[in-house]
């Protein structure tokens, strides 16, 4: 549907311009129109809901107006296959995973914000009135009030209803579509330089996927990908303006693309847009077009851009105020692990994570050394490509490379490392394109030796680019579809039962639970988080789950619904909450207003010990403070048997204790852990394994395989339960945890968030601990029991 809508809008823009667009640019121009229109209509609440029908009707009008062209036009096979191939490459990690999901999970939390914006803006525009305090509301307010660019997001939102899917499951195909349109624009830029269409298509296919573009695509960076595509499109569109016989309105496609760039990334696009517009103006003047036509064209361009960019201009002051520090601070890294190497712009980076220096071996060769060799080859080839373009007066390629480099240098002089990374990514298709032009220049020579050398040069650059893509595919972090889908079902099931609290660190919780006014207590967007932490507890840390025992009782009681990640070591909610749902990964508890709220709460247990025997002095103090006739309630639960991977007999090389989770190991490559655990009493147990798993991890007890985990990336401190239950005897049991070797499956490499945590044996099934209730006067009876907590209740 996105292709059809973009195609129809491209034909409509063509009609408005009164010129015939190059066939390969119809869809990219239509996509630009979709971005600009959706940004405009979603600015106001009154027009937001009309966005989808409006763009569909406009696309239909475009097909009707351009019907004659469509009837006489065939499919231009080479660029079409190049774009389809790029789409397939960028979509491969999701498609070959077998699940509709998205990439960049645990790598870039901003994707959750994009999901929120897409849903909210298409229904209510930028109006947040009526939203109660929650992480959902706080995140939206923070971004919308700051003038955050939303054009590329709402373009997806405009067509999402046509798919009937949650935005999370169509997000990655949209990013792949953006890069496919980049390939079409690159094909157009080299039209006059590379005569053979199949050569041109091969060059566009490779140049559209330099390592940084792939890396940003596989972390969900929607604005940056849109900018890379728009910059190439602007250059491709500026060439036809030089013709003297073009009507004044011929600038409309360029203006629409310019407005799309502003909608996609805001005023930050000006280092690219302004020079391109200046080139168009100078080129028009050089063609001896009358000054009246020059002024008229400039006026039409400025007018179209101004109207379509009203939302951006209206929020300009807020945007400048909020982004000044983020863009220019020398210490702002965003999600980077350090400043990127400028040579990464060459398009080759043999690391599964573009943020890391290549550190593996490839076919027995050192990846870092091989990277530098291939980067050097690409740079040498780029000089050949530039020289050939100059000799052939291929001005579009020279303009594209020159402006991209100048804009990148400008951003890197004033920008933060975070902004520098974006600029390097945006320039990388231009760098890769001119490097790939080098072999094409040489292959046209007369000598056989030079043609053979051209082939070797082209293969080396192609191998570097495709090798970088393959490594990124192997280390991609895919979101756990089934778990997040369960969270979405809970959000729909509990709609209207808010406010809700979730204690897991799950940045996508605020999207999937949006109908229940969710608050993630350890989120970056957590209202009144200062009131959450219990004095003397472990506190609330961003990026980590929080146990209910570490929260103030009054804070927890604010919420009607609790959405809790299932865990063998998590505390039971207060006694006035009852469980209303149990799934594979989550439980839902609802406050029962028919039960009196606890007057006081004595937390017990810590870390992997969810319960302990209370000190009699503490129970006595609780009893003394209780009103006459009160009750003491306490869940009984034993300490669960456990095996700590950090205490294994031997830890494999490449595995080490996680810096932020001292009871877990960061794992890389194949390995096994051996040890023992002791079970105090025979019975049926559920096996839980902490960690975040990409490739399969198996668990064996006494030489028998009992569980397998895989495709379950997760945040810190969380557990996954093995299906079914185990019947085990009392005593010592041998434990073996094995992580196998890699495969060709996406995400099967050693990317981010691969951890192995404690093995816990919990009670079989989903039964909750029995809550013991005794009169205050019988408080001593609780001192000898293993308890989760003790609460005081009015009778």
Where are these regions (language model features)?
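Transmembrane-helix motifs of polytopic, lipid-linked glycan transferases
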Residues: 7-12, 59-69, 173-195, 381-384
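Periplasmic/ER-lumenal interhelical loops and adjacent helix-loop junctions
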Residues: 117, 123, 130-131, 142-151, ...
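Short periplasmic/luminal acceptor-recognition loop of GT-C membrane glycosyltransferases, typified by
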Residues: 462-468, 474-537, 559-567, 589
């Amino acid at each position: 549907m996105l292709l059809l809508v973009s195609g129809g809008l491209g034909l409509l823009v063509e009609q408005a311009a009164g010129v015939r667009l190059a066939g390969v640019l119809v869809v990219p121009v239509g996509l630009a129109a979709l971005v600009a229109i959706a940004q405009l209509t979603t600015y106001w609440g009154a027009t937001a809901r009309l966005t989808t029908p409006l763009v569909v009707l406009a696309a239909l009008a475009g097909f009707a107006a351009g019907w004659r062209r469509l009837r006489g036009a065939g499919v231009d096979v080479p660029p079409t296959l190049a774009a389809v191939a790029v789409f397939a490459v960028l979509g491969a990690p999701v498609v070959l995973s077998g699940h509709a999901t998205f990439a960049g999970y645990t790598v870039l939390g901003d994707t959750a914000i994009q999901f929120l914006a897409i849903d909210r803006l298409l229904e209510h525009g930028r109006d947040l009135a009526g939203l109660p305090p929650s992480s959902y509301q706080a995140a939206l307010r923070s971004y919308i009030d700051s003038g955050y660019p939303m054009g590329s997001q709402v373009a997806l939102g405009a067509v999402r209803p046509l798919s009937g899917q949650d935005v999370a499951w169509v997000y990655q195909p949209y990013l792949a579509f953006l890069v496919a349109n980049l390939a079409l624009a690159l094909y157009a830029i080299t039209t006059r330089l590379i005569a053979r269409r199949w050569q041109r298509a091969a060059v566009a296919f490779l140049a559209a996927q330099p390592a940084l573009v792939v890396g940003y695509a596989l972390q969900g960076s929607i604005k940056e990908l849109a900018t890379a595509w728009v910059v190439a499109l602007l250059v491709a569109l500026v060439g036809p303006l030089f013709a003297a016989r073009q009507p004044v309105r011929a600038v409309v496609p360029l203006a629409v693309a310019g407005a799309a760039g502003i909608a996609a990334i805001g005023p930050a696009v000006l280092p690219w847009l302004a020079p391109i517009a200046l080139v168009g103006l100078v080129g028009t003047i050089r063609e001896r077009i009358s000054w009246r036509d020059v002024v008229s064209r400039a006026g039409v361009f400025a007018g179209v851009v101004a109207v379509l960019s009203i939302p951006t201009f209206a929020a300009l002051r807020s945007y400048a105020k909020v982004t000044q520090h983020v863009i220019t601070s020398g210490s702002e890294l965003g999600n980077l692990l350090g400043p990127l190497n400028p040579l990464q712009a060459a398009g080759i980076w043999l690391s599964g994570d573009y943020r890391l220096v290549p550190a593996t071996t490839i076919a027995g060769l050192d990846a870092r050394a091989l990277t530098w060799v291939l980067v050097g080859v690409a740079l040498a080839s780029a000089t050949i490509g530039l020289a050939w373009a100059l000799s052939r007066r291929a001005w579009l390629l020279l303009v594209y490379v020159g402006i991209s480099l100048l804009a990148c240098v400008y951003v890197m002089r004033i920008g933060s490392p975070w902004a520098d990374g974006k600029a390097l990514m945006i320039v990388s298709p231009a760098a890769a394109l001119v490097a790939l032009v080098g072999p094409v220049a040489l292959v046209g020579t007369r000598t056989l030796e030079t043609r053979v050398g051209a082939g070797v040069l082209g293969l080396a650059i192609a191998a570097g680019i495709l090798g970088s893509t393959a490594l990124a595919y192997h280390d991609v972090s895919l979101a756990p579809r089934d778990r997040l889908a369960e969270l979405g079902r809970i959000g729909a099931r509990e709609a209207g039962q808010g406010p809700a609290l979730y204690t897991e660190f799950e940045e996508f919780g605020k999207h999937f639970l949006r109908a229940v006014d969710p608050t993630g207590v350890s989120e970056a967007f957590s209202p009144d988080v200062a009131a959450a932490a219990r004095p003397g507890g472990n506190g609330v840390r961003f990026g980590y789950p929080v146990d209910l025992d570490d929260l103030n009782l009054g804070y927890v009681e604010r919420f009607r619904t609790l959405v809790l990640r299932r865990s063998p070591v998590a505390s039971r909610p207060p006694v006035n909450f009852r469980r209303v749902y149990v799934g594979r990964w989550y439980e839902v508890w609802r406050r029962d207003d028919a039960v009196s709220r606890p007057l006081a709460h004595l937390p017990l247990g810590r870390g992997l010990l969810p319960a302990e025997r209370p000190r009699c002095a503490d129970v006595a103090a609780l009893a003394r403070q209780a009103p006459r006739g009160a009750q003491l309630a306490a869940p009984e639960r034993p300490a669960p048997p456990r095996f700590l991977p950090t205490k294994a007999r031997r830890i494999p090389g490449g595995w080490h204790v996680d810096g932020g989770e001292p009871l877990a190991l960061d794992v890389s490559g194949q390995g096994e852990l051996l040890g023992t655990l002791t079970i105090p009493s025979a019975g049926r147990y559920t096996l839980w394994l902490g960690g975040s798993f990409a490739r399969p991890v198996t668990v064996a007890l006494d030489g028998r395989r009992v569980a397998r985990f895989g495709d379950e990336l997760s945040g810190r401190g969380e557990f996954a339960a093995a299906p079914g239950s185990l019947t085990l005897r009392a005593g010592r049991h041998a434990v073996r945890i094995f992580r196998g070797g890699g495969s060709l499956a996406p995400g099967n490499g050693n990317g981010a968030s691969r951890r192995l945590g404690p093995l816990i044996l919990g009670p079989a099934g989903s039964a909750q601990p029995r809550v013991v209730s005794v009169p205050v006067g019988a408080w001593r009876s609780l001192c000898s029991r293993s308890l989760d907590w003790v609460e005081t209740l009015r009778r």
